Amino acid sequence: MLTSSGYIQHHLTNAQMCTVDGSIAFNYACADAGFWTWHIDSLLFSVGLGVLFLFVFYKVGQKATTGVPGKLQCAVEMLMEFVSNAVKDSFHGRSPVIAPLALTIFVWILLMNTMDLIPVDFIPEAAKQILGVPYLKVVPTTDMNITFGLSLSVFALIVFYSIKIKGITGFVKELTLQPFNHWAFIPVNFILETIALIAKPISLSLRLFGNLYAGELIFILIALMPWWSQAALSVPWAIFHILVIVLQAFIFMMLTIVYLSMAHEDH
């Protein structure tokens, strides 16, 4: 019989794929695979939601009209205007990439976070009964690999635009001559600025992961309670969690815009 701790552990375990002795293995066989383990559920759901985002926006763009728009077109236009205003208010450089990037980050993370509102046993149990999959996590942002992948992409853009706008020399000066503008403090400046630079992707990823992981864990704990108390607890928490879902996507987007704006500042 599955215990409470076993139930929690089961729902927090990813569907894994790895290579063992030259052949592909899954789940239990990947216990000792270490770094070279693929979380295939996180990959499938994140890519699938990304494709859904592209498909919906593409279809809306194709059917866009200057007349009376439909409900979906109104929603997409409001979302695009919201992101566009956020970029105009926070980004002070010139780049046609930032607004589409911010829109992609916000909508993609929002879709991945929204998966947390699906009942915790619904999709995993269906996958187990139909496909025989023993483990399945449906919320990609509760997987640190996904959140770190997103934040490392942002980090790469920060470094790229810093070098592009300021040049190699300007980027090195930024790391070595701030905050103390004296050659004697170059080692101290380099350590402080390097830590500050590396802290950006780490804080981005851990903030998103921590909030969604905690939310998922609370849903799992509620599912362990007697049936008569589940509705009384799950509905209020789901309503509150909607705020968390939207807020975390917004924070990730805004910090990305701010960091890239800082990278475009030419001192």
From Swiss-Prot:
Entry's transmembrane regions: 38-58, 98-118, 145-165, 208-228, 238-258
MF term (GO), any: proton-transporting ATP synthase activity, rotational mechanism
Gene3D superfamilies membership: ATP synthase, F0 complex, subunit A
GO biological process, one term: proton motive force-driven plasma membrane ATP synthesis
Gene Ontology cellular-component terms listed: plasma membrane; proton-transporting ATP synthase complex
Keywords from the UniProt entry: ATP synthesis, Cell inner membrane, Cell membrane, CF(0), Hydrogen ion transport, Ion transport, Membrane, Transmembrane, Transmembrane helix, Transport
Membrane topology designation: Multi-pass membrane protein
CDD domains in the record: ATP-synt_Fo_a_6
InterPro entries given in the database record: ATP_syn_F0_a_bact/chloroplast, ATP_synth_F0_asu, ATP_synth_F0_asu_AS, F0_ATP_A_sf
Compartments in which it is found: Cell inner membrane
Function: Key component of the proton channel; it plays a direct role in the translocation of protons across the membrane.
Family: Belongs to the ATPase A chain family.
Description of how the protein assembles with itself and partners: F-type ATPases have 2 components, CF(1) - the catalytic core - and CF(0) - the membrane proton channel. CF(1) has five subunits: alpha(3), beta(3), gamma(1), delta(1), epsilon(1). CF(0) has three main subunits: a(1), b(2) and c(9-12). The alpha and beta chains form an alternating ring which encloses part of the gamma chain. CF(1) is attached to CF(0) by a central stalk formed by the gamma and epsilon chains, while a peripheral stalk is formed by the delta and b chains.
Protein name: ATP synthase subunit a
Organism: Psychromonas ingrahamii (strain DSM 17664 / CCUG 51855 / 37)
Gene transcribed to yield this protein: atpB
